[in-house]
């Protein structure tokens, strides 16, 4: 037997025994032991590096005890006792588990009962809340039913009202259709009445006719009288007299110098091409020559009278047709003898603008209109062949014709328009100053002021003398050629 302490062998002091025989037995056992005897080898029992005093067989078999006498029980006996204790422990554990199994089941049942009670309470609360919500929903349902009933009755009333309104609308539609037919018939009767009044006015008081002059071209007359002018200059002047500025371009006018348009009689007429150079020449001569003008067939008087009558006719037509003119022009505008070239040109532009405006309102064929032909446009307006004469309603204004109307006399724009005496206020030029200018295409606007029609017609016509009319036409043609020649040489 060996001790696990690993120290030197000590004699066991037991009663009746000496240390010698024990030491001898140990030496014998050591000599008989097998294995390595190394000082550093660890003990397999205590895991120390003390000196080994047991044999390997005893250690393997467990046949060893403590040498110090603490416990005489062998290791193998301890091991057997440990195994027995473990088996008893397992038996005790099984018995304990078996004894506690009933309590565990009881606890499980108690937990289940508790959870069921909690769930029952929750279900009761949920049922109470559900009942409350059902009561609220039932009350809301009753209110909704009452509301739906009211809405249904209201819808029935609205349906009845709708049917009543539809019947009323059908009656109104029939009435409107009938009134529309009546209005159209009234418009037709009004147009016929206006047409008859206008035709009576233009046939009795203001007859407008086309008069053949039967005179030679003033350029040819001037070329025969003035040998200094070259043939090229004469041809250029003749070509210039046969062209007219229309819609932004120069067009050829075959009837430029062959015809004239008369108003109130053949002795009061205007040039067909809108050339008022005879009046300009008379104004210049009036400035240089003092004293009364004794010539009764002066073309300036004829032009002034024709323009004055045209102004009166335009104002009367605007009253009959119920059309507000865009430009304010008095009946006596052309009656004065002191009209300068600028004032005269401005007044002619106003008259042409008003005539074009009336032509637009009566849907005159735009291909026939030329902005500078005053009486010819007026003749087309009051012509018996005009289909829409006397009409009422909206109309469209042609912007290109209005722009072409601005080009009356190119020499006027560069002259003394800036002087204080020649300036014209807005009230004298435009009636629609308070209205907004709209971009093209422009439709008719109702001006803010009305044109006074009932003004005194104080202009007297010249005596109907055929010879004086012919002489006036010749003088006008000669003066026209002279003005063209002056303008031509001045520009050169």
Curated annotation (Swiss-Prot):
Phosphothreonine PTM sites in chain numbering: 429
Subunit annotation: Forms homooligomers; homo-oligomerization is essential for the roles in membrane tethering and enhancement of SNARE-mediated fusion. Component of the PI3K (PI3KC3/PI3K-III/class III phosphatidylinositol 3-kinase) complex I (PI3KC3-C1) in which the core composed of the catalytic subunit PIK3C3, the regulatory subunit PIK3R4 and BECN1 is associated with ATG14. PI3KC3-C1 displays a V-shaped architecture with PIK3R4 serving as a bridge between PIK3C3 and the ATG14:BECN1 subcomplex. PI3KC3-C1 can associate with further regulatory subunits. Interacts with PIK3CB.
Matching InterPro entries: UV_resistance/autophagy_Atg14 (IPR018791)
Its membrane topology: Peripheral membrane protein
UniProt keyword Cytoplasm, yes or no: yes
Protein name: Beclin 1-associated autophagy-related key regulator
Region (Cysteine repeats): 43-58
UniProt GO molecular function: GTPase binding; phosphatidylinositol 3-kinase inhibitor activity; phosphatidylinositol 3-kinase regulator activity; protein-membrane adaptor activity
Keyword Phosphoprotein carried by entry: yes
Variant or mutagenesis effect after changing residue 58 to A: In Atg14L4C4A; fails to localize to the endoplasmic reticulum
Family: Belongs to the ATG14 family.
Organism: Homo sapiens (Human)
One BP annotation, GO: post-transcriptional regulation of gene expression
Biased segments, Low complexity type: 448-473
Start and end residues of each stretch annotated as Disordered: 410-473
Function: Required for both basal and inducible autophagy. Determines the localization of the autophagy-specific PI3-kinase complex PI3KC3-C1. Plays a role in autophagosome formation and MAP1LC3/LC3 conjugation to phosphatidylethanolamine. Promotes BECN1 translocation from the trans-Golgi network to autophagosomes. Enhances PIK3C3 activity in a BECN1-dependent manner. Essential for the autophagy-dependent phosphorylation of BECN1. Stimulates the phosphorylation of BECN1, but suppresses the phosphorylation PIK3C3 by AMPK.
Chain positions found as Phosphoserine: 29, 416
Designated gene of the protein: ATG14
Keywords tagged on the record: Autophagy, Coiled coil, Cytoplasm, Cytoplasmic vesicle, Endoplasmic reticulum, Membrane, Phosphoprotein, Ubl conjugation
Region (BATS): 413-492
